[in-house]
Amino acid sequence: MPSFTYLTAALALTSSVVASPVEKRDAFEVKQVAHGLHRKNGPAQIAKTLRKYGKAVPAHIQAAADNNAVVQADANTGSDPAVPSDQYDSSYLSPVTVGTSTVHLDFDTGSADLWVFSDLQAKSSLSGHDYYKTDASKRKSGYTWKISYGDGSGASGQVYTDKVTVGQVTATAQAVEAATSVSAQFSQDVDTDGLLGLAMSSINTVKPQQQTTWFDTVKSQLAKPLFAVTLKYHAAGTYDFGYIDSAKYTGAITYVNADASQGFWGFTASGYSVGTGATVSSSISGILDTGTTLMYVPAATAKAYYAKVSGAKLDSTQGGYVFPCSATLPNFSITVAGVKQTVPGKYINYAPITDGSSTCFGGMQPDTDIGQSIFGDIFLKSKYIVHDMSNGTPRLGFAQQAGVSS
């Protein structure tokens, strides 16, 4: 599912970040729930990622996204309701109680804002959404937030201090960013009521003073100041807060210090391999982002991968690499701290480009227009990833997910 924020909004560090008290708890699991069904549109995912990271969307990618949307809309008018099951993608979100309201949020390790649809918006923009019911007495006077993308889309609003409950833990005075205005791109995405950012608080967009993420607010009250992500292939995943669940991974967890200099959970891989081929020595610096659907790697890496896929090509009319849906895709691995982290080939087949098409869109694409590699859900769905702040310095743990062959 999509997510929305590293923005072109000013993200400079302020002198301090406000923390809030919590009710003490221990450790718990948050299960995602299926919340809506939508058609996959590869070029639209690329466009969304570019906007999220403040980059311009090239005309050919936007045209491909728009064209695929039109083709799919036309298909909806036909009499045959049957479409390939892999053309659909469930939205897996997490229920969160904000104040007295239960909303379904996208947990996003690529942003640091907790923002929600609210009753401050025009009613027309709330259609299909659950939303936060504000209490004027809890408003942080003079505080605002704004998400701004290069194409003019975005969202903005006021800031409240309220209870936010995730699983068993309640932050009793969490900064909640209540939307007053959202662009059509957001309001039309009825699957998601907002997001809960899990990146570093240093890129929170609240002004005049940045606020802590929900995790930073509660981490001192957890059994351990960490969370682990288990996204699933064609299934709901989980987020574990305060503990590591050994039943969810195989082998050992490989730890590396995270590069948080830009506010993200960053790391550097020392190489990659395709299928059973030899490891190619190549430094790949990227971030882990649960709010990004696809996986973006250096252009040379993507080219090397698709060179091993019969019939694959970089198609400008589709905005990325495509291949025959019948093709067998090789596994893809990156090397982190000397250990291979492997994505099964079938995970890299994102979807047919349109209903009934025999051409499929790749789940791995070049990072050329983004400027950094992003390891999104295509990568994460085969992994158990630990985000650890135990020593005050962020580190990442990588392990193969239980039940996923490497």
UniProtKB/Swiss-Prot annotation:
The active site is at D108, D289. One of its GO terms (biological process) is proteolysis. Keywords: Aspartyl protease, Disulfide bond, Glycoprotein, Hydrolase, Protease, Secreted, Signal, Zymogen. Its EC number is 3.4.23.-. Residues 20-65 form a propeptide. InterPro entries: Aspartic_peptidase_A1 (IPR001461), Aspartic_peptidase_AS (IPR001969), Aspergillopepsin-like_cat_dom (IPR034163), PEPTIDASE_A1 (IPR033121), Peptidase_aspartic_dom_sf (IPR021109). This is Aspartic protease SNP2. The lineage of its organism: Eukaryota, Fungi, Dikarya, Ascomycota, Pezizomycotina.
